[in-house]
Amino acid sequence: DSMTIFDNVALPIRERTDDSPKQVEARVEELFQMMDLPGVGSKYPAQLSGGMKKRVGLARALALNPKIVFFDEPTTGLDVHKSNEMYRLFHHTQARVGYTAVIVSHDVPKIFKLSDHVALLAQGVIQGQLTPEEFQRSENPLIHEFVDTTMGPIYSSEREEAALNETA
């Protein structure tokens, strides 16, 4: 919280590259533009809304052009509108930057729309790594129960045991 937003996003570039100050500034400004964050460079985190903080976090994550970006519940704390904006931003930045996103989320409908592949982790075991369409048609009881929540709690012991025995 003691660094400006500019310095926060610039930090990995300064620490991991030999870029000149002008190059660092240009990269940070490019990221601010990509994230629709005009005029935030001189502000501090406490001065930003939750959605702006999420976009700053994405800007910093993309500062070094990573091949893979991990997101853990990336829309937690956002309203539906801001959550949708974040998912659109993920899609836009993936197309522009070309990274692979690994997203941990309980927002299943959004994940099905956004993802090329979906995996369910239950009791430390990946139950399936499938396309969203295959995932929704899966006969695996745990996946089926996860997709169709009308069947009851996801960890009913008989179904869980049966599913885990199938994968063993």
Question: What positions do the PLM features span?
Answer:
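Conserved ABC ATPase "signature" region
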Residues: 22-39
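Conserved ABC ATPase signature
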Residues: 44-48, 52
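A short, proline-enriched helix->beta-strand linker immediately N-terminal to the Walker B motif
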Residues: 63-67
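Catalytic Walker B motif of ABC-type/P-loop ATPase nucleotide-binding domains
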Residues: 69-72
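H-loop/switch region of ABC-family ATPase nucleotide-binding domains
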Residues: 105-106
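A short, surface-exposed alpha-helical micro-motif characterized by mixed small hydrophobic
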Residues: 111-113
